[in-house]
């Protein structure tokens, strides 16, 4: 691994970011955590975003959990994706929190989802549960932008889900809605409620929701990348 100081300055361009990600390929999470002097959790149950934060640290990300992209200056979002030994994604991928109020006039073109997914650096990480967290290896990175077909599928799903939110049907949306994009509750506990619109236009309190990419989008994308 190149011996740049940690944490490095934010990358100046896409090429530098990709080079940094390539340099991490093949290392275990334990090796990277030890070098960064990070404590390795026993598992990810209580610290779901730990892998992403560790890689952000090495890559020089600046946004944290703000709504902008992780590498806002160069317009790139970082997404780690746990994969099986066959290179298939093991879970859905969080994109961003869904706005449940104040959505009049919002369009796909101006949406957070589209902004976050415009350019993504995907970093696959071994994710099978029998592999201890410290022994899981980082895979080869992939820079991706949605192609015409993927963008159309994302737009269609987003518009359908946003229509349901605006019409006060947020509580009837299930993870089965959407071909490649789903909406589901995102909260560590069921007491963290947020305001939304009810069926009759009245304010209601409900669990915060997040947009997630389904494996129907990420599996073919990884298969093309790794020629599976």
Curated annotation (Swiss-Prot):
* Regions crossing the membrane: none
- The answer to whether keyword Hydrolase applies is yes
Q: Where is this protein primarily located?
A: cytoplasm
GO BP term, example: mismatch repair
Q: Name one GO molecular function term.
A: endonuclease activity
For this UniProt record, give its keywords in alphabetical order, as a comma-separated list.
Answer: Cytoplasm, DNA damage, DNA repair, Endonuclease, Hydrolase, Nuclease
Gene Ontology cellular-component terms for this entry are: cytoplasm
Q: Where is the protein found, in the record's own terms?
A: Cytoplasm
Please indicate if the UniProt record lists Hydrolase as a keyword: yes
Q: Per the record, a Pfam family?
A: MutH
Top-rank taxon: Bacteria
Could you tell me which InterPro entries the record lists for this protein?
DNA_mismatch_repair_MutH (IPR004230), DNA_rep_MutH/RE_typeII_Sau3AI (IPR011337), DNA_rep_MutH/T2_RE_sf (IPR037057), Restrct_endonuc-II-like (IPR011335)
Record family assignment: Belongs to the MutH family.
Entry function: Sequence-specific endonuclease that cleaves unmethylated GATC sequences. It is involved in DNA mismatch repair.
Q: What is this protein called?
A: DNA mismatch repair protein MutH
Gene (UniProt): mutH
